[in-house]
Amino acid sequence: MGAPRTCLIFITIQLVSLAYAQEVSKRVPQGFLGMRGKKYFDEEGIEQFYKRKPQFFVGVKGKKSLQDILEAPEEYYKRAPMGFMGMRGKKDLGDSQSTELFPKRDGSLIGKIDYSSKEENADPDFPILNELLLQYLSQLDAPRNTYMQSSESMEPEQSNDLDKRAANFNQFYGVRGKKSINNKRPYDLTFRGKFIGVRGKKDLKNSNAHEIKFLVDQNGPLPKRKAQMGFFGMRGKKWTDEPSLEMDMPN
């Protein structure tokens, strides 16, 4: 009798706690600023969560639709910033010679300068400016110094084939230019110093065995070279006509 009554009381307590828990509304903690996950909203309740752009909005976050720009290009027209001094790109002018599209200021020379040559007829609208330009061009064509011209005419003409003279000895550090070889042989060897040796190889092709033996003999003009201590190889190969030449050579 006691056990069923205890079970009934326990079940009753559980049902009461579940019913009370459903009636209590849960509130978010204080200071809650974000949400983990996403909420599902119907299309009717989206407007209340619309985020407006912040105040003092300067730029655009994202890209603009090309269709909106084509439909209303006046709304998306960008004007140059204050103090704009330059231009990115070039303007296409139909007539490059015309100066009507350029803004003219007070004292500006745009459209007033005659760029034609002296052979062409000057513009009668600007006689003073044309005269000044012709005078300036004549000064450029004329010699700058008549004295230099007269002194140069008195000097005899010199060709570029002459040798160049070096500077002072205490300031000379090398050869400036090239020396003429007209008065010298193309392979003049007189400038060399003491003869030391010949860097090359001996010609054994046209020599016989007696000549080679005389040259490499110990008492001959060219004593035979002995191998170095620890010599294990040879740099290159020697070529001889007779294969038994080494047998005749003294050790």
Curated annotation (Swiss-Prot):
Residues 1-21 form the signal peptide. Tachykinin-related peptide 1: Expressed in antennal lobe (AL) and gnathal ganglion (GNG) (at protein level). Expression in AL detected in all animals, in GNG in most animals (at protein level). Not expressed in corpora cardiaca (CC) and corpora allata (CA) (at protein level). Tachykinin-related peptide 2: Expressed in antennal lobe (AL) corpora cardiaca (CC) and corpora allata (CA) with expression detected in few animals (at protein level). Not expressed in gnathal ganglion (GNG) (at protein level). Residues 22-25, 39-50, 65-163, 180-183, 203-223, 239-251 form a propeptide. The keyword Signal applies. The modification Arginine amide is found at residues 36, 176, 199, 235. GO terms for cellular component: extracellular region. The keyword Signal applies. One of its GO terms (biological process) is neuropeptide signaling pathway. It is found in: Secreted. The modification Lysine amide is found at residue 61. Keywords: Amidation, Cleavage on pair of basic residues, Neuropeptide, Secreted, Signal. Tachykinins are active peptides which excite neurons, evoke behavioral responses, are potent vasodilators and secretagogues, and contract (directly or indirectly) many smooth muscles. Belongs to the tachykinin family. This is Tachykinins.
